[in-house]
Amino acid sequence: MKASIRVKLETLVERYEEVQHLLGDPDVIGDQNKFRALSREYSQLEEVTQCFQAYEQAQEDLVAAQEMAQEDDEEMREMAQEEIKDAKEAIERLTDELQVLLLPKDPNDERNCFLEIRAGAGGDEAGIFAGNLFRMYSRFAEKKGWRVEVMSSNEAEHGGYKEMIAKVSGEGAYGVLKFESGGHRVQRVPETESQGRVHTSACTVAVMAEIPEADLPEIKAADLKIDTFRASGAGGQHVNTTDSAIRITHLPTGTVVECQDERSQHKNKAKAMSVLAARIIQAEEARRAAAVSDTRRNLLGSGDRSDRIRTYNYPQGRVSDHRINLTVYRLNEVMEGDLGCLIEPVVLEYQADQLAALAEQN
C-alpha cells in the first residue's frame, strides 16, 4: 500500500473516532441537525474504518505466519504456508475494497431524487410502458424502504403516462437511481395488436438529485413565466374546476415544468419550483461533464432520448443493458422491482472506470 493512501486512511480513522466521541456529547445530542449530520458521517466512515482495521489485522497475520514458517517443526511450517496464503488473499481483497471506498464521492449520492419518466416514440404503447416503468421503480423503492411521492403526472388516454415526475425519498436514493437516466426501449406485442406483431416503443428516464434549499441556485422572478390552468385527466377531461395547475418556464434556459397533482395552486408551484431548480442544476452539471472529457464511457445516462441504455424484450423474457453489454433473462422479476441484477453490474463498471482514471493520473 502506498504511503499516501495509508496516511489518508489513518486520517479517516482519526476522524471516525472523533465523530464517535462527538455523538456522545450532550450539546450535539441536543442539536438535531448537527446530530443527524454527524450520524450520517459516522456511518460513512464506519465502513472504511472497519475495512482498514481488517487490512491491518491481515498484515499482522501474514507477519506471524511468515515467522511460523521458520519453525523446525514440519507440521507447523505446512500450517504456516496455509495461513500465509489466506492472509495474502485477504490483503489483496481488502486492498481492492479500500480502493473503491476511497474513490471520490458524489456529494449528491445520499440525497433524495426526482424521477422523471416520459413516453417517447410508440404512441399508446409508449404511454403504457411509462406506467410499467413507474410501477417497476415504485416496487424497487418499496423494497429499499424508500418513499415515492408523485409530483406531477400527465395520464395517457389508453393507460400509463405521457409524463410522470415523482420524488423518491430515502438514504442513497440518487446514488442508486442515477444510473437509470437514459432511453428505455420495449419490444412486445401490444394488447390491441390483432396480428401478434412485436412493436418497439420507447420512454426516457431522467434522475435528478434533490438539492437542499440552501444550495439552490438563485432564480430571478423576472426569468420566470408562470401560467395557471385547470388540471385535467386522461382524454382531457377536467378533474378540477379551479386554475390550480401550474406551468413554469425558465426563460434563459427554456426549461418547462408543469405540476397539477395538488388541489392547491401554492403547493403545485412549490413542487414545480423544486423540480425546476433540480433540472437547471442537472443541465449545468451535464454541460460541464461533457466539456471536461468525452473519451471515457459515460455510464451515467443523460436522460436524452437518443441515449439508449436498456431494452426490455418481452417475447424473449430478456433485459439488455447496452452500456456494459449485459443481458439477463429475468424480465418478470425486473418489472416487479428486482433491479439489483441490472444496477449493481453498472455500478461496478463505473467504479472500475473511476479506478482506471485515477491510475492514469498517477
From Swiss-Prot:
* Superkingdom classification of source: Bacteria
A GO cellular component entry from the record: cytoplasm
Which InterPro entries did the record assign? PCRF, Pep_chain_release_fac_I, Pep_chain_release_fac_I_sf, Prokaryotic/Mito_RF, RF-1
Q: Name one GO molecular function term.
A: translation release factor activity, codon specific
Residues recorded as bearing N5-methylglutamine in the entry: 237
Question: Main localization of the protein?
Answer: cytoplasm
Please outline how this chain is modified post-translation: Methylated by PrmC. Methylation increases the termination efficiency of RF1.
Please provide the record's keywords in A-Z order. Answer: Cytoplasm, Methylation, Protein biosynthesis
Q: Where in the cell is it found?
A: Cytoplasm
Q: Does the keyword Cytoplasm apply?
A: yes
- Biological role: Peptide chain release factor 1 directs the termination of translation in response to the peptide chain termination codons UAG and UAA.
Question: What NCBIfam families is this protein classified in?
Answer: prfA, PRK00591.1
Q: What HAMAP family does the record tag this protein with?
A: Rel_fac_1
What the record says about family reads:
Belongs to the prokaryotic/mitochondrial release factor family.
Q: What is this protein called?
A: Peptide chain release factor 1
Q: Which organism is it from?
A: Aliivibrio fischeri (strain ATCC 700601 / ES114) (Vibrio fischeri)
Q: Which gene encodes it?
A: prfA
